[in-house]
Amino acid sequence: MYRGCLAIPYMRWSPWRNWSVAAIRYRRLDDGKPKYMTMPGDKPRLYNTVALTRYSRDMAITEGEIDAITAELCGIPTVGVPGAQMWKPHFRELFLGYRNVNILADGDEPGMEFAKSVAKTLPNARIIPMPEGEDVNSLVTSQGKDALLERI
């Protein structure tokens, strides 16, 4: 079932185990459906919560793990939400202490809807839209990291 998929580990902190794998999400590398799969019964959670443990005045949120990885590689502390409908009200508390929470919105209608739904729950949110038809990963892949950094 998961053969030929990219395994994306979701980590969590425990004082007894330090960082350990809490869940694994799988992304198909072919064009098959569904594009993403999780273990049965898994609950929505944030990807790359280790970013929340590092000192930073600003934090970014993306829709999806690949965009979060790409933004992190560009030097932007970023967590990912595993889909446009997966932002949960209790996530809000994790972001209230930041100067800005930059929501790196995909350049399409669902991406803007995701960004708006997150932004309305955070008083420190700023929506940073990607160009039409682009997401963080495709923008950096086609134009380089400066294209992303200049938007912020």
From Swiss-Prot:
Q: Report the residue ranges that make up the Toprim domain in this protein.
A: 57-137
The protein's matches in Pfam families, at most eight in alphabetical order, are given as: Toprim_2
Give the protein's recorded name: Gene 57 protein
Which Gene3D superfamilies does the record match to this protein?
3.40.1360.10
SMART domains associated with the record: TOPRIM
Which gene codes for it? 57
